[in-house]
C-alpha cells in the first residue's frame, strides 16, 4: 500500500507526502518485487504472452529502433549516444533471429531521409516509430523479445528462428514486472530532483540500475550464454560490465547542468529498466516529458494523454461518453501540447 501511495503522490506532485513515506515499508529490495510469475502450464494457460505472441509462430511485431538506440544495440555511430557502450541487459532483452542485414523489400525505408535510423546495424531488425510501410514476410528474421522478461531465448549469436526447436528458451516461464524495487529507487530519485524530496537522487539512480541489472542477468537460468560456435566466448554480462555502465551513467549525470538535465537521465534509465512494463513509462512520460523519444516518421496526431473507452463499453452503456485522446487525467496538469 505504501508503494502505491508513492506512485500516486509522484503522479500528483506531492513531495511532502512522499517525504512522509521515506520511513515506511516500501518495495525497495528484490525479494519484495511485485511481479506476476508465468509458468509453462497450459491448463490453465499460464505462459507469458510475450512468449506466446512471438515464439511459436514467429515474432508478431517490430521492435523499436529508438529503443535499440537507448540500449546502444547498433553500430555505435551517430545518433547512438548516451553511455557509449552496449547496455549489459541487451542480450537478455532482445533476441536476433538472423545474422544478415535487411535489404530490398525487407528494408523499404532505405535511402529515405525522413527516417532517423531505418536500420541500426548489428542484425537488429526493427522499425522507426510510425513507419507504416508494407510488411514483408520477415517474421522469422525480426528482432524479438529475449529471455527477460518473457521467458524467451538468450542471444548468444545462435541466430536461430524463434519457432525452431533448435532455439533454447525458457518456454515462456517469464514474469510481468508490475512494480519492482528498482522502480522504487528511480521514483524516489525523480522525487528528489523534481519535487524537492530530501534524498540522494544520484545514489538512488545507481541503486536502481544495479537492482535492474542483477534481476535481468539472473534471469537466463540454465540457458547457455556462450557462443554457438566457440564456447570460449561468453556473452553473459559480468559485474565489470555493469560497473562500467553505471560509472558512465553517473559521469553523465555529474556533467549534466541543472536538475532538469539530471532528471532526463534518471527517467531514461528507469525507462530502460522497465522493459516488459508499459504502464510506468507511459506515466513518467506524461508526468515529466522524458525520456526524449523518437519523433514519428509520419504525423500521427496528438500524443494520447489518456486511453479511449473500449467500444464494447460505449456500445452497451449509453451513459458513457467517449473520451478523446488528448483528454488529460486528473493528475496530468501539464499544459496541452506538453508532449508532441
Ranges and model annotations:
Residues 1-220, 259-261, 269:
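Structured, solvent-exposed acidic/aromatic patches
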Residues 210-340:
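C-terminal functional modules
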Amino acid at each position: 500500500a505504501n508503494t502505491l501511495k508513492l506512485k500516486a503522490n509522484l503522479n500528483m506532485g506531492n513531495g511532502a507526502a512522499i517525504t512522509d513515506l521515506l520511513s515506511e515499508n516500501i518495495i525497495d529490495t528484490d525479494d519484495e518485487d511485485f511481479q506476476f510469475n508465468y509458468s509453462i502450464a497450459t491448463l490453465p494457460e499460464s505462459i507469458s504472452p510475450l512468449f506466446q505472441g512471438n515464439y511459436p509462430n514467429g515474432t508478431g511485431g517490430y521492435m523499436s529502433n529508438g529503443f535499440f538506440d537507448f540500449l546502444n544495440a547498433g553500430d555505435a555511430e551517430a545518433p547512438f549516444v548516451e553511455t557509449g557502450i552496449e547496455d549489459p541487459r541487451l542480450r537478455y532483452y532482445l533476441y536476433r533471429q538472423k545474422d544478415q542485414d535487411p535489404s530490398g523489400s525487407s528494408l523499404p525505408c532505405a535511402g529515405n531521409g525522413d527516417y532517423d535510423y531505418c536500420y541500426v546495424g548489428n542484425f537488429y531488425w526493427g522499425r522507426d516509430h510510425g513507419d507504416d510501410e508494407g510488411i514483408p514476410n520477415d517474421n522469422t528474421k525480426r528482432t524479438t523479445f529475449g529471455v527477460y522478461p518473457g521467458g524467451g531465448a538468450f542471444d548468444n549469436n545462435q541466430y536461430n528462428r524463434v519457432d525452431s526447436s533448435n532455439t533454447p528458451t525458457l518456454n515462456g516461464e517469464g514474469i510481468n514486472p508490475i512494480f519492482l524495487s528498482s522502480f522504487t529507487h528511480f521514483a524516489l530519485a525523480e522525487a528528489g530532483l523534481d519535487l524537492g524530496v530530501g534524498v540522494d537522487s544520484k545514489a538512488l539512480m545507481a541503486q536502481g540500475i544495479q537492482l535492474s541489472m542483477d534481476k535481468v542477468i539472473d534471469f537466463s537460468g540454465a540457458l547457455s550464454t556462450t557462443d554457438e560456435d566457440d564456447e570460449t566466448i561468453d556473452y553473459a554480462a559480468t559485474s565489470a560490465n555493469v560497473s562500467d555502465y553505471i560509472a558512465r551513467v553517473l559521469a553523465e549525470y555529474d556533467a549534466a547542468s541543472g536538475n532538469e538535465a539530471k532528471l532526463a537521465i534518471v527517467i531514461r534509465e528507469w525507462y530502460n529498466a522497465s522493459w516488459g512494463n508499459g504502464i510506468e513509462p507511459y506515466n513518467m512520460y506524461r508526468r515529466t516529458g522524458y525520456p526524449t523519444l523518437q519523433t514519428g516518421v509520419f504525423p500521427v496526431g496528438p500524443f494520447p494523454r489518456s486511453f479511449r473507452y473500449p467500444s464494447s463499453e460505449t456500445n452497451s452503456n449509453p451513459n458513457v461518453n467517449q473520451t478523446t485522446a488528448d483528454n488529460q487525467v486528473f493528475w496530468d496538469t501539464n499544459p496541452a501540447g506538453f508532449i508532441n
